[in-house]
């Protein structure tokens, strides 16, 4: 780490930039796989580069936050801001996501337990196949919850990444009270949905690998993930 400081003990911003440029590509590739093919990698890289530049310029080691943690916030946030500015998610998909979350919340409040897919589909007035397709569509749009957290809770609650661990938008929240609520809410999820979140965010398995564990296809894993995120949103909204 000494190479990042000048002889006078001042952080060398140029060296910091050079060392962490690969992080921009890493985050861009992780994000791109969850986005429509129309989203270009170069656009994400450009936005992420601006985010890294902001991180280099604004980082204050005295605040006690590791630079990697801070940089990931800035890089990923810049990429999401770019996506948001283009409004790439169709309004119908946003509307469906809200309707699904609302139906789940209403049912679980009425039933006092986790609602089944069939029950949610019936509440929405659609068949199970259409409901599962809706889950797929909304899962592709929600950026695995990061953007949804920012929309609901604002920039005052940031997602953070440990230096040695993949970014985890469900558990690593700066606000300790909210983190505890998230963990408690995850424990109440149906076992398969809880397992999907654990395998993806903690064990770092991809959708294909998770599908092999559950003996289902990737699309089914995506549906389970989408439903789990929506359950968490409704559960956290009641806490």
From Swiss-Prot:
GO biological process: bacterial-type flagellum assembly; bacterial-type flagellum-dependent cell motility; DNA-templated transcription initiation; regulation of DNA-templated transcription; regulation of DNA-templated transcription initiation
Keyword Oxidoreductase recorded: no
Gene Ontology CC terms: cytosol; cytosolic DNA-directed RNA polymerase complex
Chain residue ranges for the region called Sigma-70 factor domain-2: 16-88
Residue window of motif Interaction with polymerase core subunit RpoC: 43-46
Effect annotated for changing residue 84 to A: Loss of activity
Compartments where located: Cytoplasm
Pfam short name (any one): Sigma70_r4
Protein name per its UniProtKB record: RNA polymerase sigma factor FliA
Native source species: Escherichia coli (strain K12)
Lineage of the species this protein comes from: Bacteria, Pseudomonadati, Pseudomonadota, Gammaproteobacteria, Enterobacterales
């Amino acid at each position: 780490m000494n190479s990042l400081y000048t002889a006078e003990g001042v952080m060398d911003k140029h060296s910091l930039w050079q060392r962490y440029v690969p992080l921009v590509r890493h985050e861009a590739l992780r994000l791109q796989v969850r986005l429509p093919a129309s989203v270009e990698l170069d656009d994400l890289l450009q936005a992420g580069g601006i985010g890294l530049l902001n991180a280099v310029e604004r980082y204050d080691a005295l605040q006690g936050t590791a630079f990697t943690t801070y940089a990931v916030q800035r890089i990923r946030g810049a990429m999401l801001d770019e996506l948001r500015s283009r409004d790439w998610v169709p309004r119908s998909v946003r509307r469906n996501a809200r309707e699904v979350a609302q139906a789940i919340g209403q049912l679980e409040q009425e039933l006092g337990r986790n609602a089944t897919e069939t029950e949610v589909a019936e509440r929405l007035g659609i068949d199970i196949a259409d409901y599962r397709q809706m889950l797929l569509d909304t899962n592709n749009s929600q950026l695995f919850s990061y953007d949804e957290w920012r929309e609901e809770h604002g920039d005052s609650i940031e997602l953070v990444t440990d230096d040695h661990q993949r970014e985890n938008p469900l558990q690593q929240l700066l606000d300790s009270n909210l983190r505890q609520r998230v963990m408690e809410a995850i424990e109440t999820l149906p076992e398969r949905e809880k397992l999907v979140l654990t395998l993806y965010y903690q064990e770092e398995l991809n959708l294909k690998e998770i599908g092999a564990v559950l003996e289902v296809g990737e699309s089914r894993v995506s549906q389970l993930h989408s439903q789990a995120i929506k359950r968490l949103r409704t559960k956290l909204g009641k806490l």
